[in-house]
Amino acid sequence: MQGLEYTLEPEQAKKCKTHQLVDLAKIDLNSWSQENVRPKTLLGRTSKKRLTSQFWYEFTKKQKLKNALYYFVIYDITDNSILPVETLNQKNPLSTSFPFPFGRPLRGINFSGSCLHCLLRVLK
């Protein structure tokens, strides 16, 4: 699979008034290392895909973001590029019944409505 990159600029992203903007490019990845992600919560697997998926789940949960567009990414193991997995927008995204399918890649991009404008360029 080839890596995907969005070309939406921040000014375009501001068009959406519904969601908080989560600029993933400004996240300090060094402060969110594996020690912040408990491997025992990874369904017994520590592959790069599952680890990264759990990484974003832990990040958004700890940040306690509300009414935000949650954008999860995984790393493609073949070329280490960032791929979109799933967007999640619900009233209570921090509920215990978190529906994010760990490790399931998204086949094609089909974001609809203003949510597309919430996606900023994702940098490694």
Swiss-Prot record:
Localization in the cell: Plastid, Chloroplast
Major subcellular location class = plastid
Which UniProt keywords are listed?
A: Chloroplast, Plastid
GO terms under cellular component: chloroplast
Protein name (record): Uncharacterized 14.4 kDa protein in 16S rRNA region
Q: Which organism is it from?
A: Chlamydomonas reinhardtii (Chlamydomonas smithii)
Q: What is the lineage of its organism?
A: Eukaryota, Viridiplantae, Chlorophyta, core chlorophytes, Chlorophyceae
